[in-house]
């Protein structure tokens, strides 16, 4: 039985998140003062028009904002720890294992030089200490779960050999591979 106080503890708390992009033309405040609270087992949808900061918010939570962007303010508390204060080595154990993300553009998220099965298997090897054979078996199971026909053969395909929809299914299969506590779908 779960303690009542434990059940009420947020899994994710984003407080006053501010992510800005520093360009030659000035500062773009892509995310400016976002607050989010997600409890275990809860589903939260963020909606808005194109360019309003939904993806930047998700990438900020994952600490995947690249230059010229930067999280300039706020807190991202995951299970009580501020992700913005974690060293990158510790963040790498959180990312993909405890928090996972389904990216919007599978063609740019999948590595074109590795077979899709290798990419899913790598996630399992790095975060869950699966052996090669166990990772291959689990990869095929995950591909089947997302409705990819002939999963054994598709695991051997390179990303460019898949349709856009099939590549998106690979991303959907990869994200929950390690049974994360939080899944972000962009």
Give residue spans per PLM region.
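ABC ATPase NBD coupling module
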Residues: 83-100, 126
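Conserved ABC ATPase signature
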Residues: 157-162, 166
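Conserved ABC transporter NBD signature motif
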Residues: 71-82
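Conserved ABC ATPase "signature" region
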Residues: 82, 134-153
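A short, proline-enriched helix->beta-strand linker immediately N-terminal to the Walker B motif
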Residues: 177-181
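Hydrophobic anchor residue at the start of the ABC signature
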Residues: 120, 172
């Amino acid at each position: 039985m779960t303690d009542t106080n434990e059940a009420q503890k947020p899994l994710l708390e984003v407080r006053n998140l501010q992510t800005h992009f520093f360009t030659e033309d000035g500062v773009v405040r892509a995310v400016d003062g976002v607050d989010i609270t997600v409890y275990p087992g809860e589903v939260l949808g963020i909606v808005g028009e194109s360019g309003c900061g939904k993806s930047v918010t998700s990438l900020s939570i994952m600490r995947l904002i690249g230059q010229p962007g930067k999280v300039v303010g706020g807190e991202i508390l995951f299970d009580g720890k501020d992700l913005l204060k974690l060293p990158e080595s510790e963040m790498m154990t959180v990312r993909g294992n405890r928090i996972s993300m389904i990216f919007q553009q599978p063609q740019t998220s999948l590595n074109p030089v590795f077979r899709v099965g290798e990419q899913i298997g790598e996630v399992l090897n790095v975060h869950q200490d699966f052996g090669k054979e166990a990772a291959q078996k689990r990869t095929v199971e995950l591909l089947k779960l997302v409705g990819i026909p002939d999963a054994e053969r598709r695991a051997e395909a390179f990303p460019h050999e898949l349709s856009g929809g099939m590549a998106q299914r690979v991303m959907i299969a990869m994200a929950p591979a390690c049974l994360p506590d939080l899944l972000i779908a962009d």
